[in-house]
Amino acid sequence: MSEKKRVRVRTPGGKELELTPEKTWVLAPKGRKGVKIGLFKDPESGKYFRHKLPDDYPV
């Protein structure tokens, strides 16, 4: 199993942390370039949140 890269994100609590996304996908309108989205879990509150991933992130 390959290790996913850590991404620097701002959590809903306002802190900036390096987290690994639990799930990634591409969100794209029909016929256009999309953006990569990651699902992260806040380590403090346990809440899930979404954040944009860099374009070079493997999906």
From Swiss-Prot:
GO MF terms held by the record: double-stranded DNA binding
Keywords: Chromosome, Cytoplasm, DNA-binding, Methylation
Domain of life: Archaea
UniProt key word DNA-binding: yes
Chain segments annotated as transmembrane: none
GO cellular component: chromosome; cytoplasm
Quaternary assembly: Monomer.
Protein name: Chromatin protein Cren7
Gene (UniProt): creN7
